Amino acid sequence: MSLIKKKNKDIRIIPLGGVGEIAKNMYIVEVDDEMFMLDAGLMFPEDEMLGIDIVIPDISYVLENKEKLKGIFLTHGHEHAIGAVSYVLEQLDAPVYGSKLTIALIKENMKARNIDKKVRYYTVNNDSIMRFKNVNISFFNTTHSIPDSLGVCIHTSYGAIVYTGEFKFDQSLHGHYAPDIKRMAEIGEEGVFVLISDSTEAEKPGYNTPENVIEHHMYDAFAKVRGRLIVSCYASNFIRIQQVLNIASKLNRKVSFLGRSLESSFNIARKMGYFDIPKDLLIPITEVDNYPKNEVIIIATGMQGEPVEALSQMAQHKHKIMNIEEGDSVFLAITASANMEVIIANTLNELVRAGAHIIPNNKKIHASSHGCMEELKMMINIMKPEYFIPVQGEFKMQIAHAKLAAEAGVAPEKIFLVEKGDVINYNGKDMILNEKVNSGNILIDGIGIGDVGNIVLRDRHLLAEDGIFIAVVTLDPKNRRIAAGPEIQSRGFVYVRESEDLLREAEEKVREIVEAGLQEKRIEWSEIKQNMRDQISKLLFESTKRRPMIIPVISEI
């Protein structure tokens, strides 16, 4: 059945996130005068983003054109896809489309952030068709590590614009995790104009190990454990959590969760029937010590680096609930991102030092939730797109995916490597990338949205690395003299007792600068402060090779 509704003219595709990074998915598709947002995800901060809680895409372009926005279409319930939805809805009105579980998780996010706003939610599935003025939109089931994942298909007169979301192919999975390859093939036969596809594992050869094989090998590994077993995984990896529950039941072990991030999403999914949990399998973490060590499994969960951080604290005996003991076994069911590799290596060393046995994480007992090379080529061959846009990955992953598309038969000149804010235009004849819109990161610090910029981050780095140096002086401007001070206060810069000579020298330098400023015909406070910053910075760098943040404080009587 053809879902083409009318003859279209102009198409624009704009990534606002999810390119050059593995997170923060957000893609804008405009067909004539209608705009559609595909996913609205967040990113957890990188190490250098000191004090930042989360990062979301800059949606200033969407806000400038909000009357055109017809809806937010979500592929699955991970934070990379839905984490920014509540922030978007604070700034504009738009209906939200997603699977039953995804919508439930969005509602929970809105509730957690105390956003009391009437939102139009539409629950969609593999059979849903949403009709708009210029296009029709349908969906197809995909496989990911969370149930009810979907791909989105925007039907235009030029063919379908297909957004895969995050996916892999696994014939061993059924029910809420099963892909609808038949529906994908139908879309491919109807004609795919543009394929926008997940690039996360585009550099990994072959296929993922099927999940039924993973569970079999996990069972064999866990069955050999004689003491307490701790499994570390992301709270969002529902497949892995279900597998641990299955194995625990077979081994007659109780299961307890360690980590707050799992509680809300797990409880929602459990109530909706997405988890199969044998009776009396779960116990509170506070009751673990009531059971023999060989009768429990602890699942340490969290978002991003939280599970690894928890293990590190446990290994150093700094965790407030549980610590690693001699004879514990630990399994990390985590795919290490580039910025996590060093942290994980250090944590493994800490665990071994604390007496833990590490169950090796290899292809037999762990699989990615993203398609590897052959799975990505399979999607391309099923869809047979005219144009191809690799997304959801670092730039090197996008390039690797572009090469796979060329191998699968897509003309190289019809493959677009895009960055945030790039605009791909199609006017009925040519597809060109010749425009850019505002894009970037919005940093969330506490309840502040976008009020932390690069200057603030620079200052935080300065404070973290070199400390702070405060010079306080009280002036009597009427009599042009120093009434009190200078007084020097330092934090995180030098140990005061061992640097008394340097601090006295700094006090004298401040006195010289201030007294010179007081002799001027017109006293310029800003100029005096800047001279203090410049000259004190030079003095301190010559003595210590460090540049603390210098704050001059001048008060008057």
From Swiss-Prot:
Annotated EC: 3.1.-.-
Main localization (coarse): cytoplasm
Functional description taken from the UniProt entry: An RNase that has 5'-3' exonuclease and possibly endoonuclease activity. Involved in maturation of rRNA and in some organisms also mRNA maturation and/or decay.
A GO BP annotation: rRNA processing
SUPFAM superfamilies linked: Metallo-hydrolase/oxidoreductase
Keyword set, alphabetical order: Cytoplasm, Endonuclease, Exonuclease, Hydrolase, Metal-binding, Nuclease, RNA-binding, rRNA processing, Zinc
The organism's place on the tree of life at top rank: Bacteria
PANTHER family referenced in this protein's UniProt entry, alphabetically: RIBONUCLEASE J, RIBONUCLEASE J 2
Protein name, UniProt field: Ribonuclease J 2
Cofactor dependence: Zn(2+)
